[in-house]
Amino acid sequence: MFPRVAFLGQYPVPSKDLPLTFISLEEWTLVRLHGPDVIQCLHNQFTCDIQNLNKHKYSFAAHCNPKGKMISNLYVFHLKNQEMAFIERLNICKKQIEEMKKYMVFSNVTVIPDYNAILIGIAGTNARNHLSMFFSVLPNKTHTIIHTQDVTLLYLSSPSERFLLIINKKSVLDYLLNESQSQIQFNDSRQWVSLDMEAGYPIIEPITSELFIPQAVNMDILDGISFNKGCYIGQESIARIKYRGYNKQTLYRLNGVMDYKKNYNLPAAGDQVELKINNQHWKNVGIVLQSCQIKKDNIWVQVVLNRSILEPSELRITNTQTHDNLMFYY
């Protein structure tokens, strides 16, 4: 197994200010699935329509428990005949695969986490122009995934154009790095996390797994749920919430300012979000999914909040020192 690639980290930068950057995605992993039953198996478990998934596109998807609560979210796509794959957070991969295998006893499908696959993000100024020096064809809004001999490229349009590369040979990565060294910056997965937060892509950790329905974390907005396909795990609860209007939670990104000279603890997944009531009391209204420090003195926090909250409101995060005046917006 290759050692996981991790570039030296620095403070993440908002997409509008991001120079051309290579980003190591050491917090994500690739999972391969192959066998004659692979399409039907995933179709019966994931929220998206696997049977009608275009081979030139990937889809956002959620894997849920029988109650419709999301175990994890992922990108799923075709690799080649009778082989599919998905990308998800590394720290939830083991749990998610174990849950998936419970319903695969009679399916002819093999599931293999591919820890040798190298995942790299490329984002920032002129990312497409730079990649075009190495690849004759790049993915776009119409064809969101492209396969070459040693690299698969995924296109993401939000918050600005960026690319996710699945590299099968270390020598290919070395070549890209050697040829790009003078033109790019490097960062670790925190930069990709911040871009996902800007884009409204939920980041589910083990502690927040199985807490939310997919609609509470934008999976319907991201076209990660099909309401026209046949039965899948959790479908009854997910459909009921859509058609009866029961979704009382939604995804937000909070913005806060901190004194970078002090030794703060960033909000952590699972921390509680509280709303100030009548300028004196605090009420629990949500849960933290993820946070990151932007540049030196800004904090972004991805949270799930009750829909009943009015904007703007004064919020704080419990169990941390960074809990004052976090104003929320989409």
From Swiss-Prot:
GO cellular component terms, A-Z: cytoplasm
Location relative to the cell: Cytoplasm
PANTHER family: TRANSFERASE CAF17, MITOCHONDRIAL-RELATED
Function, in words: Folate-binding protein involved in regulating the level of ATP-DnaA and in the modification of some tRNAs. It is probably a key factor in regulatory networks that act via tRNA modification, such as initiation of chromosomal replication.
Residues the entry annotates as binding folate: 28, 192
Ranges that cross the membrane: none
Pfam families from the UniProt entry: GCV_T, YgfZ_barrel
Main location: cytoplasm
Domain of life per record: Bacteria
Sequence similarity: Belongs to the tRNA-modifying YgfZ family.
GO BP, one annotated term: iron-sulfur cluster assembly
UniProt keyword annotations, A-Z: Cytoplasm, Folate-binding, tRNA processing
Gene3D superfamilies assigned to the protein according to its UniProt record, in alphabetical order: 2.40.30.160, 3.30.70.1630, Aminomethyltransferase beta-barrel domains
Protein's recorded name: tRNA-modifying protein YgfZ
Molecular function via GO: folic acid binding
Organism of derivation: Blochmanniella pennsylvanica (strain BPEN)
